[in-house]
C-alpha cells in the first residue's frame, strides 16, 4: 500500500484541551496517516509554518472553548494565504457545520471517525495526483 499523506493537527491558540485531538491523532495513525501533532494552545504562525514545511495536504484543528473560535478563524485565514492547497478539518464541542463553513473550513467533523473518513477522501485525491 502507498504511504498515506501527511496530516498536521493542533488545538488552536488559547485552548488547552487536547483529548479530542489526541483521539483523532490515534485514529489517523491507526489508519496509516503520518500525523504531526503540534499540541495545544498553538499560535496560527506555528501551525502554518508546519503545514508549509511538510507540504501537508490536511490540517486538523480543534477548539473546545467559544473564546478560541476567533483564533481558529485566524489560523484558517493564514493557511489560505500560506498553504492554499491544504484541506482544513475542524472539530470540537463549540463547533457545528454552519460555523465551520462561516470561518472557512473545508470540513466539519462531528466526531473522530468523521475526521478520518474525510482524511481518507483527501488521501485518495492526493495519491491520484502523485
Where are the regions a protein language model picked out?
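C-terminal amphipathic alpha-helical interaction region
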Residues: 12-18
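Short glycine-centered, acidic/aromatic-flanked micro-motifs in structured strand/loop junctions
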Residues: 9-12, 61-63
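A charged, well-structured terminal subsegment
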Residues: 118-130
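Cofactor-cradling patches in redox/metallo enzymes
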Residues: 21-31, 35-106, 111-120
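Long, charged amphipathic helices and adjacent flexible linkers at domain junctions
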Residues: 1-10
Amino acid at each position: 500500500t502507498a504511504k498515506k499523506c501527511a496530516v498536521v493537527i493542533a488545538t488552536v491558540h488559547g485552548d488547552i484541551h487536547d483529548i479530542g485531538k489526541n483521539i483523532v491523532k490515534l485514529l489517523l495513525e491507526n489508519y496509516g496517516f503520518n500525523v504531526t501533532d503540534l499540541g495545544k494552545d498553538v499560535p496560527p504562525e506555528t501551525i502554518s509554518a508546519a503545514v508549509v514545511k511538510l507540504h501537508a495536504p490536511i490540517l486538523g484543528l480543534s477548539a473546545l472553548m467559544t473564546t478560541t473560535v476567533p483564533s481558529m478563524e485566524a489560523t484558517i485565514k493564514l493557511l489560505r494565504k500560506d498553504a492554499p492547497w491544504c484541506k482544513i478539518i475542524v472539530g470540537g464541542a463549540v463547533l457545528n457545520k454552519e460555523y465551520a463553513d462561516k470561518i472557512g473550513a473545508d470540513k466539519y467533523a462531528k466526531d473522530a471517525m468523521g475526521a478520518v473518513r474525510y482524511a481518507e477522501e483527501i488521501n485518495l485525491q492526493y495519491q491520484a495526483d502523485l
